Amino acid sequence: MYLVSIYFDEKTTSRIQGYITQVAKRRGNPFMIEKNVPPHLTISAFETRSEDQVISLFEETRDMFQSGEIIWCSVGAFFPNVLYLSPVLNTYLQELSEKVYKELLKIADVKVHKCYRPMQWVPHATIGKKLSKEEMLAAFQVLQEQFGVFSSRVVRIGFAKTNPYEELWKKVM
């Protein structure tokens, strides 16, 4: 599995990492911390055997990736065991999703995951993963006590493979 993800300014990264750490401490589920998952928002998830072609494609089109603003407004869940922060789906995020999808379709063997296609996508930043029912309740309580609407700036986009995580390409914006 491969991912295209965006990353945030230092203040936002610190804030989201704080939520991740508090959720892990409250219930003793260190999955996100142990896996060294940095705060991010995944734009696309896909399968391919053409890793080098994807890297070349992103390098050729790097100028189309620009910084943008995101407003984080809500907390959500993918049941039964994922808790996340959700931004407003603004023009910046929608257009970025569409651009990445359109570019990836130029590579014959790319298969984009059905939940990461434009207009079939839930933008989110995972706070807790593989949470039990009790851990989900505790995680919601942490965010109920600490979360408030905030804005952030996207400062980097990257292409990576998972299991184990390895960044293959990036652009600092």
Task: Name what the model sees in each region.
Residues 1-69, 92-151, 167-173:
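Basic, often amphipathic N-terminal segments
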Residues 7-9, 73, 88, 155, ...:
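A structural detector for beta-sheet-dominated domains
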Residues 75-78, 154-168:
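Glycine-rich beta-strand-turn "strand-cap" elements at beta-sheet edges
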Residues 78-81, 119-121:
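Acidic/polar active-site rim loop that often engages polyanionic ligands
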Residues 3, 82, 156:
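Short hydrophobic/aromatic beta-strand or adjacent loop that forms the aromatic wall/cage
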Residues 46, 75, 88-90:
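Histidine- and/or cysteine-centered catalytic micro-motif in compact active-site loops
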